[in-house]
Amino acid sequence: MSTVSDTATDTLKAKTKDGSVISGGHLVAKALKAEGVDTIFTLCGGHIIDIYDGCLDEGIRIVDVRHEQTAAHAADGYARQTGKLGCVVTTAGPGCTNAVTGVATAFRSESPILHIGGQSSLSQHKM
């Protein structure tokens, strides 16, 4: 497994059939890979580091941009040009809302994109 988030001890984890532990981010990446996603468009944020780790392990390319709206528009353009699902991954809060214009554009154009928004850790919710 990758080590980008080794310092993140407060992430969702689950046990696999063989008894090993897997993070929620790795589960997301496995699901993306199973659906044929080979590229994600994103702006790096702390709430989504585990997803990056999983994507690296699954061979999913990570395209890091300078604004979440750019990531959403890039996912839209990718979907239109390749016919594949475009995937935008944003961090929690403003990261999600910054992608809304690009997601709305894709929606109105019937472009197949998926927007995954991050969430703060469970301990921040006192769970």
Where are these regions (language model features)?
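N-terminal alpha/beta PP-like core and its mobile active-site loop of ThDP/TPP-dependent enzymes
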Residues: 2-127
